[in-house]
């Protein structure tokens, strides 16, 4: 799609003022049946599993339904802007979501987690978001290729697939 001037915004760095053209109305509920919502959550169970990787859970104020492979936008109090993180867990109508995060030098959210200042904090949450999901009704072979912390969303997909005895 590069030849059409398209790119993945999640993999881009803005270097100057820019303008985005969205051809038509984007309605997430048309493809997922979900409405992302704002809410708060409590960060808990933080555990460093490697020098630059931590896992933690969020206890959401309200239950959410999300599709395996989706993500939530997270923001610590006083932080400007949200950061997207894929859930590693999968459960329907849940108040619990699990994450694995790699330290990103200069990353406000990840640096706060690794500095230890975020433990047991409240977190602003928006979501669920994303269309890189698993739908077992498609009944197709499932091939997952990932690396690094990109494994998070795939862990959610594999969790659902295993729970359904998909393989």
Q: How would you label these PLM feature ranges?
A:
Residues 8, 16, 64, 130, ...:
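Glycine-centered loop/turn positions within well-structured domains
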Residues 94-95, 101-167:
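FNR/FR-type flavoprotein reductase catalytic core
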